[in-house]
Amino acid sequence: MKRLLIVVAGIGLCSGIVGPESARAAEKYPVKPITCIVGVEAGADGDVLVRPVMQRVSKLLGQPVVIVNKPGGGSSIAYREIHGAKPDGYTIGWGSATIITNKLQGVSPLDYHDFTHLGAYTTFFPIVIASTKSQNRFNTIQEAIAYAKANPGKLNMSTAGVGQSWWVAAMSFIGGTGISVNTIPQPGAGAMTVAQVAGGHADVGVAALGSAKSMIEGGQVKFLATLGEGRAPAPYDKIPTVRELGYDVSWESTNFVMGPPNMPKEVVATLVAAVEKAVKDPEYIKLANETNTRWEYVPPAGIIPAFDKRRAAVREIMSKAGILKEAK
């Protein structure tokens, strides 16, 4: 577990003869530091983008926000701790699409319905990459799809570990395009996938743009298509989405801020306003787009409907793959 103080923001005490404890009690929330639990390791994609959000929230609320990294179990360890925290607003946390896959895999009984949502701030999207070293080389996604259809089971596709978010993306791509491939799942969330493709051990792979960017720029892999709802930010905005080519394929991982259930309404309102203002900061928008994600703010009311739709698609994919073990 890593604990890092993002920023220290002072809060003034009431003047006069009132003692420190009385002054703190008289202040509106927050009157002490807030903990933000993040279910991935420090430096991971999700961690990198939640930190500047919390830095801005800290400045807006006048209290430090302490990031506590608790990776493991597909982020389920962190989710359990957030859910079980005292609902006073002093423990909040990070969430992603793994909150859907965890329950469907039987890893955790919790899902996104079991938390207080405070706003979503960015969306990670997977891409399809092709090796420049393998025997089968492709310049476009259409070439890769055509080859897979003409040679069932011959295209080697590297994916994230079974059940991981980018594995779900790969299954969505395979099913949506109607191809038959030889999948090669790799440990973790996608870094090994890129290494396999770059080394010529797989023809194509599905990974995050952030994980593949250096290999794309170095020429070891080619960026063929995006599996998200929209195209990647510049300079990759000329690369098509698979959906715009006529295939019903889409998968994204939205990151959001949440807290335990049953938080006081006034505390929720304070946090929601701070998260929204932090996320809409022009400098944060620029940072998000430069970090190979798509910036977007989704208010709390929009998170559950969006995840309900995505959950239905994931459930079908996992059922077909024989790994549906929905926790009760």
Q: Which ranges hold each PLM region?
A:
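Short coil/turn segments
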Residues: 41-43, 97, 132-137, 160-164, ...
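Mature extracytoplasmic/periplasmic domains
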Residues: 269, 280, 285-306
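Short, low-complexity disordered leader/linker segments with a strong preference
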Residues: 1-31, 325-328
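Hinge/capping helix and adjacent helix->loop/strand transition within the periplasmic-binding protein
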Residues: 59, 81-90, 103-192, 242, ...
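A ligand-binding cleft/hinge motif common to bilobed small-molecule-binding domains
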Residues: 97-107, 167-176, 203-237
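N-terminal (or domain-start) structured segment
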Residues: 24-114, 154, 177-206, 215, ...
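Soluble non-cytosolic domains of exported or imported proteins
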Residues: 44, 48, 73, 164, ...
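C-terminal lobe and pocket-closing loops
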Residues: 123, 211-280, 309-312, 317, ...
